[in-house]
Amino acid sequence: ELTDRVIAEPSKIDVAERVCEVLGVESDSVPACSDGEVVDALGRSRLGVKIQDGCNHRCTYCIVWKARGPERSVPVESVLEQVREAQEAGVPEVVLTGVNLGAYYGKSATDEHVEIDELLEAIMERTSIPHVRISSVEPMDISERLLKVMARYPQRIAPFLHLPVQSGCTATLHRMGRPYSAEAFEDTVRMIRANLPQVSLSCDVIVGFPGETDEEFEESLALCRRVGFSRMHVFRYSK
């Protein structure tokens, strides 16, 4: 086995102590590690704002759901405060990040649940940050509501989406546990481009997934060519 143990992200500060237990040494002999420092945003052109963590999906190639736990979202007011702080520090662009960004379901000041499109609208209306960029969004979480918000603010919201398609073959996608077909993904791309004609699309693709035949690989390659991604992150499958 290549992996003996997976430690969840919130427990990373305990890694040194656990390693000491395995090695049989005193943890006091290991230099202490702080809980982290706030990164000085002055002079930076872009700053990540984490709005979500965790994942409820069970894709067969992924261990993130175990490492990061169930989906949870940062409250709307907290997100807005972070964006304003970045703006006051002179940062011209914030990037909204999360393990499963499209699953954002944070609470508002009135205790109502807010989805990603509503959060983006709130950032536009209640902050003056010059530019906002959305990081990776699962294909099945792309909604026309989100696209219309992006289209309403072309000068402030980057016309960019990263779509972790993983494969362009429906049979491979099913083995991966992905909840969409290759055809459904292309329908999503058409919807995106109908609302955002100038959009730039990037993607993640896994090659060599267990059971993938030469024919399935060619199907995946053909889809990528039809879509015409601006950039691709290609990963060879590994255990």
Regions found by a protein language model. Give the residues of each.
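Conserved SAM/AdoMet-binding glycine-rich loop
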Residues: 1, 88-214
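Proteins enriched for Cys/Gly/acidic motifs involved in redox and nucleic-acid/cofactor modification
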Residues: 1-105, 115, 161, 183-194, ...
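Generic structural signal for secondary-structure transition and capping sites
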Residues: 24-27, 128, 155, 229
